[in-house]
């Protein structure tokens, strides 16, 4: 009878910090504001663009039932956009200023969706389009305590859209909501799905931080509300039409970082960094040849490595939290992974959560074997044995089938929140623990 032989070994892993560079910022959230990084002393600025979508069965009441009218034409009583936010970094009471710009056309250029790109500002803002400036605080000081105490309260930045609006055809409306209502009743098919809405009615809006500093917030939902009245059975009722910036439509964040300040951290060798948004990644060189040497015909059952956090000694009241999730991806695959909307497969891409003061990848043996085979077959790139640790956010979907449920990953995105962690490594190699097996 064959006997299973188990062996273990460990190997050094070299790590270093690298500049994140220009990363794909398409995400399910937007980020807005300006904040001074306590680690670098430099400012991070975040602006974002969003489109708006509708449900497939979107419809409005019969035009004849609308009470809100002017000279026989349907009008909106009012219109506003609300930026619903959470995950505030910095001083929530800091006075901030934003400017909202209407887009002239839907964003279609993939290059415009990267953090360093100014293409949206240079190529997509409508000249003479709808613009609104707004002062705000992320403490939501304009909402009274009674409303904040309500169960369904969610803080938001409220942007009025009630001034006259002139569309691209030169037609002027009472407000932006009136434009939407009259467009709907003249051609309801333009509101039949998000694609037609974006291409024919609302290309999108860009929200730019133009004043103040001290905070950045995560905008997890952007909703446009159109308020009007209808008459039914002799009574008048208030009604709302809403259009949402959700994960089904395009959202992207533009980031301004101080690259020189980031480079000073990259040059440190006392550890490595992960900094978001679009700041610093950690690169690992895996000792593939050493791991496989003498075990070419053995099974590699597991290869485990932990990236341990160096505790933050900052005394700043706004010390940054560590990224919640990180992706391990081959260095030569990082650009295509995000551009092609791939998700982790736990064969050559892995996600780990921040837990017990670090990130643990329990088994990357399939990646080790794949790298070795690529080199052996002559298909390896110059970075064949290098991986990059990238802070990410993920989305998932749960499907219920009777008493059973299954959860599936639906998206992996570059983390655009303001987070930072210093990890063991650099001058001090990490250890990867390997378990082999073979039959004798």
How would you describe each model-predicted region?
Residues 1-440:
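Secreted, disulfide-rich extracellular signaling modules
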């Amino acid at each position: 009878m064959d006997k299973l032989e188990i062996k273990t070994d460990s190997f050094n892993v070299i790590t270093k910090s690298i500049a994140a560079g220009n990363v794909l910022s398409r995400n399910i959230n937007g980020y807005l504001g300006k904040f001074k990084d306590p680690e670098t002393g430099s400012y991070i600025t975040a602006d974002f663009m969003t489109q708006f979508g509708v449900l497939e069965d979107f419809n409005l009441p019969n035009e004849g039932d609308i009470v809100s009218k002017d000279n026989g034409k349907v009008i909106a009583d009012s219109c506003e956009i609300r930026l619903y936010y959470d995950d505030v970094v910095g001083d929530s009471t800091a006075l901030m200023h934003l400017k909202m710009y209407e887009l002239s056309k839907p964003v279609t250029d993939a290059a415009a969706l990267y953090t360093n790109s100014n293409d949206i500002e240079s190529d997509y803002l409508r000249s003479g389009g709808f613009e609104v400036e707004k002062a705000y605080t992320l403490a939501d000081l304009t909402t009274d305590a009674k409303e904040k105490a309500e169960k369904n309260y969610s803080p938001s930045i409220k942007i009025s859209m009630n001034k006259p609006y002139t569309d691209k055809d030169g037609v002027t409306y009472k407000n932006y909501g009136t434009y939407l209502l009259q467009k709907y009743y003249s051609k309801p098919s333009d509101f039949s799905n998000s694609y037609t809405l974006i291409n024919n009615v609302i290309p999108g809006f860009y929200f730019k931080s133009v004043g103040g500093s001290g905070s950045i917030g995560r905008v997890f939902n952007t909703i446009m509300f159109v308020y009007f009245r209808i008459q039914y059975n002799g009574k008048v009722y208030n009604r709302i039409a809403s259009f949402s910036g959700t994960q089904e439509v395009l959202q992207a964040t533009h980031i301004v970082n101080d690259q020189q300040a980031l480079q000073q951290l990259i040059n440190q060798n006392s550890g490595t960094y992960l900094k978001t948004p679009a700041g610093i990644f950690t690169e690992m060189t895996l000792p593939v040849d050493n791991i496989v040497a003498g075990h070419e015909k053995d099974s590699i059952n597991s290869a485990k490595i932990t990236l341990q956090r160096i505790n933050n000694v900052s005394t700043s009241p706004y010390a940054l939290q560590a990224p919640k999730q990180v992706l391990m991806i081959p260095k030569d695959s990082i650009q295509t992974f995000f551009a092609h909307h791939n998700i982790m497969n736990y064969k050559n891409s892995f996600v780990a959560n921040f837990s017990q003061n670090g990130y643990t990848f329990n088994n990357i043996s399939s990646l080790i074997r794949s790298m070795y085979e690529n080199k052996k077959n002559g298909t390896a790139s110059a970075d064949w044995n290098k991986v990059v640790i990238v802070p990410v956010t993920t989305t998932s979907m749960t499907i219920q089938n009777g008493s059973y449920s299954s959860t599936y990953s639906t998206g992996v995105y570059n983390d655009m929140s303001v987070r930072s962690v210093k990890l063991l490594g650099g001058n001090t190699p990490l250890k990867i623990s390997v378990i082999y097996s073979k039959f004798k």
